[in-house]
Amino acid sequence: MKKIIGLVGIAGVILLSACSNSDEALVISGKPWTEQFILPQILGQYIEEKTDIDVEYKEGLGEVAIMTPALEKGDIDLYVEYTGTGLKDVLKEESEVGESSDSVLEKVRKGYEEKFEATWLSPLGFENTYTLAYTKDNEYNAETYSDMVEASKTGGMVFGAPHAFYERKGDGFDDLINTYPFVFSETQSLDPNVMYEALKNGDVDVIPAFTTDGRIERFDLQTTTDDLGFFPKYDAAPVVRMDALEKFPELEDVLNELAGKISEEDMLKMNARVDIDGDKPEDVAHDFLVEKGLIEK
């Protein structure tokens, strides 16, 4: 049995305060964007296939500032978070340059257990982090950020990013160029919704993209690797209330069966199916689980 409740933003908080979880259901939620509509479906459908647990979905609940208190209060039991987000945005801790995935995971696991009575399970296998993307027409032949620095020194390279990227502290534009000494001829502040079109149309030459964004593949963009480890790790992993693990003793082992099963390419392709082809997240999730042999058709 599954129930689906669509909640967005502040309205979601109001509704959450008015109604509590079903006592017998595991409540899975996500943030209000494509990847976070797909991932709850992957987790939920797999749980339903492998256990007798009833699953309730609360879709598109909000960003991390809403998800964290909802998890802490028990309004939701489970969602997928990214280790770097948990470390920087929730725990307000810094990641060391080049810090390993295991180290970041251990920090967030310890912090969430102490502060929120929730824990992080094994990562799903992909990281959704920043990459510097450019069109292949530019012929920079850059595979790493350091390669892009060298290409920028030839002149004429225009960088475009959302306004928020220029304002971010710790892992925004100013800190980026302190680590990587780019020589941009111009920087532009762009609406995130038009950033890829600006790149495709040649209005800018380089943008900070997310590694699992389906438009990378569909627009045939070239991506680069953060070779100096400037950005923290953003490994995707299930975050679950510890009392839910007690209530459903089989849950932890079942969720950990998904560890390492979703590659960056898998996630990118699934996002593209929803964002570009218009497929439903639940159908994309089902197809993925079937194709990987994780559930029956």
Stretches found by the model and what they are:
Residues S20-S22:
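Bacterial signal peptide processing site
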Residues A25-L61, F126-Y196, D279-E282:
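Bilobed "Venus flytrap"/periplasmic-binding protein-like clamshell domains
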Residues D102-V158, M242, G260-E264:
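A conserved helix-loop-strand patch within extracytoplasmic ligand-binding domains
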Residues E63-V64, G74-L87, V104, T135, ...:
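Beta->alpha turn/N-cap motifs
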Residues L15-A18:
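C-terminal motif of bacterial Sec signal peptides marking the signal peptidase cleavage site
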Residues Y46, A65-I76, K92-E94, D174-T179, ...:
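Short helices/loops that flank or line small-molecule/ion binding pockets
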Residues E35, Y166-D171, D175-F182, E250, ...:
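An extracytoplasmic/periplasmic, membrane-proximal ligand-sensing/linker region
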Residues V90-S100, V108-L121, D203, R215-G229:
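Ligand-binding "clamshell"
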